[in-house]
């Protein structure tokens, strides 16, 4: 009995002295803000680019807004070997808990995405709240860009760009966790934000200084290019392969379907009704600005309902939108808005939003046959037994032919008597 009591006391005391297995002194770490991964398909080399900030340049444990960090790249046959080479060129321990963005080049997204995700999942220190970015060309070029008018680390700048600006629908944030969930969930394909760098090309700035240790081509230091960033569009995947880009309008259509909280301006024609009984391309607006209505979208949400009739699934998309009409309108008739005019404006706004939705459906259901919408996942969630019995193994084949109905309900809220028709003398 005494031995048992003594053993319990010893075991309970041990728990008071436990520590972190990966503990490191703050002064001995290199804070990683950006991680970029590229692939050279000519020789099957993987290039990893890390942007880090030395803790010696921080103030009181906080990173100064004016610190841009340093960008290093290493080339190897595997991801882990490239990271190890970067560790050899870094005085502090590489510390990924500050990671803001994971940037993947287009070739890497096409050929080695599975290896990238496997490495991320095996590295517990990498934050799954960091954003996944797909960029055309090379990730190392994006990471080594710095805004001369707002000199902060590119990873933090891109993160702020995606979070600090109201969602205009042309792109949206996707975290590592969300991206992996889309990869493993049934009936949905992955998407990720598209970010590009803008600015002038400068030969001197694009040159890289050689770093001692290893061969000169294995590890290099990037002198940062002056430029800025633009986030627009989305990258789409089928399984673990990158398959194409969504442009601004297609991304907006996908945002309507997914129920993203969109804050953006929307314009419609005043003198033409559009027939949406079949899939249609975008409306080409008349250059006459007198025939254009302008709205500001204040709220949006959607609901996807899947019905099964005689084993044939049907997708119903219901989108609700609230909008504000700009202060003046250019229609004919009464000086102030009448209920009939308001109803007509709401119908035109609904048709314009429906056009966005049908455009992205036409391309990705009918042409590329990739379920980036998650219709299959909604079928699985709403009818799990039928999904496993009839659709799980054949969804890719039947998805392009599934009928889709779209209903948009738009409400204009600011239609008081202060909204007057614009008179120009």
Please place each PLM-identified region on the residue numbering.
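Membrane-proximal alpha-helical signals and transmembrane carboxylates
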Residues: 5-6, 15-425
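Sec-dependent signal peptide recognition
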Residues: 2-10
């Amino acid at each position: 009995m005494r031995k048992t009591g003594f053993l319990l006391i010893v075991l309970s005391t041990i728990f008071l002295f436990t520590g972190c297995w990966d503990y490191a002194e703050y002064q001995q770490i290199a804070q990683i803000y950006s991680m970029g991964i590229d692939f050279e398909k000519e020789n099957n080399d993987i290039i990893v680019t890390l942007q880090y900030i030395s803790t010696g340049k921080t103030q009181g444990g906080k990173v100064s807004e004016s610190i841009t960090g340093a960008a290093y790249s290493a080339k190897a046959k595997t991801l882990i070997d490239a990271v190890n080479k970067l560790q050899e060129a870094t005085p502090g321990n590489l510390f990924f808990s500050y990671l803001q963005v994971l940037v993947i080049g287009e070739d890497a997204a096409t050929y080695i995405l599975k290896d990238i995700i496997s490495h991320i999942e095996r590295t517990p220190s990498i934050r799954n709240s960091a954003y996944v970015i797909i960029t055309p060309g090379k990730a190392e070029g994006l990471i080594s860009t710095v805004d001369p008018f707002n000199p902060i680390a590119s990873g933090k700048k891109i993160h702020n760009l995606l979070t600090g600006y109201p969602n205009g629908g042309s792109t949206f944030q996707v975290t590592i966790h969300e991206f992996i969930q889309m990869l493993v969930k049934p009936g949905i394909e992955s998407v990720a934000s598209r970010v590009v760098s803008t600015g002038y090309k400068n030969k001197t700035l694009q040159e890289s200084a050689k770093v001692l240790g290893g061969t000169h081509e294995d590890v290099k230091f990037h002198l940062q290019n002056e430029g800025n960033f633009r986030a627009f569009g989305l990258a789409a995947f089928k399984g673990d392969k990158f398959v194409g880009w969504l442009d601004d309008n297609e991304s907006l259509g996908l945002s309507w379907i997914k129920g993203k909280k969109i804050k953006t301006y929307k314009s419609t024609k005043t003198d033409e009704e559009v027939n949406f009984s079949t899939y249609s391309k975008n409306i080409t607006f008349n250059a006459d600005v007198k025939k254009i209505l302008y709205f500001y979208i204040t709220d949006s949400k959607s609901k996807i309902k899947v019905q099964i009739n005689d084993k044939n699934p049907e997708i119903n998309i219901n989108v609700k939108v609230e909008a504000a009409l700009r202060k003046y309108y250019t229609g004919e008739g009464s000086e102030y808005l009448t209920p009939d005019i308001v109803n007509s404006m709401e119908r035109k706004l609904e048709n314009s939003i429906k056009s966005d939705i049908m455009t992205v459906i036409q391309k990705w259901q009918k042409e590329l046959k990739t379920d980036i919408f998650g219709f299959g996942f909604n079928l699985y969630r709403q009818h799990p037994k039928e999904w496993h019995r009839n659709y799980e193994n054949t969804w890719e084949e039947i998805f392009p032919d599934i009928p889709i109905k779209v209903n948009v309900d738009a409400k204009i809220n600011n239609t008081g008597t202060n909204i007057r028709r614009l008179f120009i003398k």
